[in-house]
Every structure is written in structure tokens, then in C-alpha cells.
């Protein structure tokens, strides 16, 4: 009895799969219709909040893409479950009729359920067909028309070869942004749209923060993971085999050779000193001393041979890391725009004192009084990482010129951009700097 009941539950679950999958796709299509109805509320957020136009656009586009993905995934599950049911029906011809099984089979052929399924499928098909035209008309054409009307206040999306050009933040116009936002909030209060706008703005802020943090995590972990995977699985065994078999040289640079010779001279002098301190000059055997020096020479050769392999490995690993990071920047232009907007909003939401504090902290770290010593350590580490000679003249030349260039760039950014956005930040910065 229990066995038959378990079989009946399995059959019931399998035959219910098409209805559940179709219901998921139907709810996702309803979600698309809701996003399209709430489109004008999203558009009002632009005038009543600090959100950038790109963040709103990418939020709407992401929600639509998620719903479309759920629809296609549910329809695939629907087709697979129908295929499984057909297999059950075919195999049922080879077995004896089961009363429980017969109770389930007629449910598939009910006319009402068939009509309901056909209506839902037609609704989903019409929603997907309408979505592309809706996107072209509202997400592109209407945005471009709004850009022409409000170009004195904001910078919107621009159309170029049917593609979107990313703009990081709202531009400065003749009318201050605080006035337009206050007017838009007052208008929303009059039309009883404040609660819905707050909810939409919260969802948009949540999406913007999550998308930015995910992109930062991808920029940090994916290049490291890819380079580490290639290093351990492919590059390290291949380079060791290639260097030890096909390369006769041991030292990759002259700096390594000079360093090894100095080390060998120090070892030989230490051996002579140890023998002289232990025995008299007449009892020192040159053969034993030569064997010990020869053994230390072999160990030094092995050490510097491994160092040469590590230098080549570091070069290829860093190249893979750079290529992976460049691909992430190229493929993630939309996320980069959102990250730029989110970072600017975080910066502009701070008080003038905190803004000036972070600017001073960054400038003092890079071009402050103690920064040349830090730059010397960084450059020396980079030279040792790639196996180059530790040249004091090159390091001093770089340290004496590069911070000056950075100082010029910082001053240009402060007086060019911050002076336009918020003159009080520049005044606070000069006060704290003095």
C-alpha cells in the first residue's frame, strides 16, 4: 500500500510539472507588464532623487532581463516535463493498467485545462513580442526626447548607432539640481506619488549598491583566480620543463649573475675563515675546502635557476592578470558606469569637511612629505618582482618626477571640477591644508 502511494505521489508530481512551470512563466510575464506600467514612476525618480539616469535605465533593463530569463527557463522546464509525460504514456502501454495511474491520465486531457494552458501560452508569447518594440520606443526614443527638453539640467542617454553611450553622473546646468529635485518632490506630494517613489528609489539604490559591490568583487577576485589557475595548472610545469631542458643558461639577467658571484665570494671567504679559526694554516686541506665550495656553488645555481623560472612565471602570470582585467573592463562597461555613479553619490553625500579630509588623505599618501620613501619601496619591489637591476638613478629620477605630475593632476581636478560642483569643498580643503 505504501509502495503504491509513493508511486502515485511521484506520478502526480511529474504530471503537475507542466502546470507549475507554465505558472512560473505566466507570473514572470505579469512581472514584465508591471514593470512597464511602473515605467513612468521610474522616470519621475530621476527628477526627485540623486540617482543617475544610467542607474535607472540599467535597473529597469536588468529587471526585464531577469523576467525574460525566468520565462525562457520555465518554458524549457515545461517542454521537458511534457516530454517526460509522453515517455510515461508510451511506457504505460507495456505495463498493466493501474487504477491509480488511470486516475491521473485523464486529467491531462481535460478541455478546460487545455484552454487555460493555451491562453497562458498566448499571453506569454504576446508579452515577449511586445517587449522588444516597447524597449526600442520607451527606453531609447523617449529618453532621447527627454534629453533634448532637459539638457540644461541633466545629461541623459545619447543614441549613437543604436547603442547607449554611458554618462557617469548628472551634469551641471544653469538651474541648481537641488531646486529641480525639491520641485519634483513637491509635485510628487501633490499627486500622492511620494510613497511609491520612495519604494522605487529604495529598490534602485539597493540594485545600484549590489551591482557596484559585485563588480568590485569581480575586478578583484576573477583576475587573481584566473591567473592563479593558469599559473598552477599550465604555466608552472610548462616553464620548468622548458627552462630546464631547452635552455642552457641559468641566469636570466646580469643582475642575477653579479649577485650570485658576490654570494659565492662571501661563502668562500667564510669557509677560509672557518678553517683558519679551527686549524692551523699547515693542516688546511685544499681538497676538502674545494668540495665544500663546489657543493655550495651547486646549491646557489639551483637557487638562481629557480629564481629565473619564477621571473618568467611572474611575467606571464601578470600578463594573464592584465588581459583578464582588461576584458572585465571592456565587457562590463554598463557595470562600470553604475560603479562610477555609485562612487560619486557616496562622495557627494558626505559633508564638506569629510570630503576635504579624504582629498587631503589621498594627496598626502601620494604626493605628501613622506611619499618619496613609499614610492622608492614600491618601485624597488616592482623591479625585484620582474628581475630587473636595482638602479638608484632610475628610482630617484622616477620619485622626483612622478609625484610632481600627480600633484599637478590633483590640483587640476580640484580647481576644474570641485570648484564647479561645490566651491565650499575647495575652501574647506585650503583651510585644512593650511
UniProtKB/Swiss-Prot annotation:
What span is annotated as the signal peptide, if there is one? none
What membrane topology is annotated for this entry? Multi-pass membrane protein
* Pfam families referenced in this protein's UniProt entry, alphabetically: CemA
Q: Where in the cell is it found?
A: Plastid, Chloroplast inner membrane
Q: Please state which protein family the record places this protein in.
A: Belongs to the CemA family.
- What is the recorded function of this protein according to its Swiss-Prot or TrEMBL entry? Contributes to K(+)/H(+) antiport activity by supporting proton efflux to control proton extrusion and homeostasis in chloroplasts in a light-dependent manner to modulate photosynthesis. Prevents excessive induction of non-photochemical quenching (NPQ) under continuous-light conditions. Indirectly promotes efficient inorganic carbon uptake into chloroplasts.
Protein's name according to its UniProt entry: Potassium/proton antiporter CemA
Report the source organism.
Marchantia polymorpha (Common liverwort)
Amino acid at each position: 500500500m505504501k509502495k503504491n502511494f509513493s508511486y502515485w505521489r511521484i506520478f502526480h508530481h511529474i504530471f503537475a510539472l507542466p502546470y507549475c512551470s507554465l505558472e512560473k512563466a505566466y507570473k514572470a510575464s505579469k512581472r514584465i507588464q508591471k514593470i512597464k506600467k511602473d515605467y513612468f514612476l521610474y522616470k519621475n525618480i530621476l527628477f526627485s532623487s540623486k540617482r543617475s539616469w544610467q542607474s535607472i535605465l540599467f535597473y529597469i533593463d536588468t529587471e526585464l532581463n531577469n523576467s525574460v530569463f525566468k520565462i525562457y527557463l520555465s518554458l524549457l522546464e515545461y517542454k521537458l516535463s511534457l516530454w517526460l509525460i509522453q515517455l510515461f504514456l508510451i511506457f504505460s502501454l507495456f505495463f498493466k493498467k493501474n487504477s491509480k495511474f488511470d486516475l491521473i491520465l485523464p486529467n491531462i486531457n481535460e478541455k478546460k485545462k487545455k484552454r487555460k494552458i493555451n491562453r497562458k501560452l498566448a499571453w506569454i508569447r504576446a508579452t515577449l513580442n511586445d517587449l522588444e518594440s516597447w524597449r526600442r520606443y520607451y527606453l531609447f526614443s523617449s529618453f532621447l526626447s527627454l534629453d533634448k527638453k532637459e539638457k540644461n539640467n541633466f545629461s541623459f542617454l545619447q543614441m549613437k548607432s543604436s547603442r547607449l553611450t554611458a554618462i557617469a553622473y548628472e551634469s551641471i546646468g544653469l538651474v541648481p539640481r537641488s531646486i529641480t529635485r525639491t520641485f519634483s518632490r513637491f509635485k510628487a506630494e501633490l499627486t500622492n506619488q511620494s510613497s511609491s517613489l520612495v519604494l522605487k528609489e529604495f529598490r534602485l539604490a539597493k540594485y545600484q549598491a549590489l551591482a557596484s559591490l559585485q563588480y568590485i568583487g569581480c575586478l578583484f577576485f576573477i583576475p587573481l583566480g584566473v591567473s592563479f589557475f593558469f599559473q598552477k595548472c599550465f604555466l608552472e610545469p610548462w616553464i620548468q620543463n622548458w627552462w630546464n631542458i631547452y635552455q642552457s643558461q641559468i641566469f636570466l639577467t646580469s643582475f642575477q649573475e653579479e649577485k650570485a658571484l658576490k654570494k659565492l665570494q662571501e661563502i668562500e671567504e667564510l669557509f677560509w675563515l672557518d678553517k683558519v679559526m679551527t686549524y692551523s694554516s699547515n693542516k688546511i686541506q685544499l681538497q676538502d675546502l674545494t668540495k665544500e665550495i663546489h657543493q655550495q656553488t651547486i646549491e646557489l645555481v639551483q637557487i638562481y635557476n629557480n629564481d629565473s623560472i619564477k621571473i618568467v612565471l611572474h611575467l606571464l602570470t601578470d600578463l594573464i592578470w592584465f588581459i583578464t582585467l582588461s576584458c572585465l573592463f571592456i565587457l562590463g562597461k554598463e557595470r562600470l558606469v553604475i560603479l562610477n555613479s555609485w562612487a560619486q553619490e557616496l562622495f557627494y553625500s558626505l559633508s564638506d569637511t569629510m570630503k576635504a579630509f579624504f582629498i587631503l588623505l589621498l594627496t598626502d599618501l601620494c604626493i605628501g612629505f613622506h611619499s618619496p620613501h613609499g614610492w622608492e619601496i614600491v618601485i624597488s619591489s616592482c623591479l625585484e618582482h620582474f628581475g630587473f637591476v636595482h638602479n638608484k638613478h632610475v628610482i630617484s629620477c622616477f620619485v622626483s618626477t612622478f609625484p610632481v605630475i600627480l600633484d599637478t593632476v590633483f590640483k587640476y581636478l580640484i580647481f576644474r571640477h570641485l570648484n564647479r560642483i561645490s566651491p565650499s569643498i575647495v575652501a574647506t580643503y585650503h583651510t585644512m591644508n593650511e
